[in-house]
């Protein structure tokens, strides 16, 4: 009985590891869009935190450099927050059925 239980646990652990690997790949390839200035600046970022694209509204071309820098920084920060939120939501959904002890932190 103990031997079968251990084999079952090992199989579950392997399946979980495979699911985690697939989830991490999906998260890394996911794209989010952060915005600032009511959409005047947008930043597209991957789950790896790679910035793919920055879009500036034409009306901003008349603004001074400092305003543009602030808006770009705010849009990047918004994208980073969205990447983190997306990761947390996906991982929470994956671990929802697991019997984990209170306060247990997954190693990812």
Swiss-Prot record:
Sorted alphabetically, the keyword list is: Cytoplasm, DNA-binding
Its Gene Ontology cellular component terms are:
bacterial nucleoid; cytosol
Cysteine disulfide partners in this protein: none
Outline the segment boundaries, as ranges, of region: Disordered: 1-25
The record's GO molecular-function terms, alphabetically, read: DNA binding
Known Gene3D superfamilies for this protein?
A: Nucleoid-associated protein YbaB-like domain
What job does the chain carry out? Binds to DNA and alters its conformation. May be involved in regulation of gene expression, nucleoid organization and DNA protection.
Family to which the UniProt record says this protein belongs:
Belongs to the YbaB/EbfC family.
Q: Assembly and partners?
A: Homodimer.
PANTHER family per the UniProt record, alphabetical:
NUCLEOID-ASSOCIATED PROTEIN YBAB
Q: What is this protein called?
A: Nucleoid-associated protein Pmen_2646
Native species of this protein?
Ectopseudomonas mendocina (strain ymp) (Pseudomonas mendocina)
Q: Which classification does the entry list for the species?
A: Bacteria, Pseudomonadati, Pseudomonadota, Gammaproteobacteria, Pseudomonadales
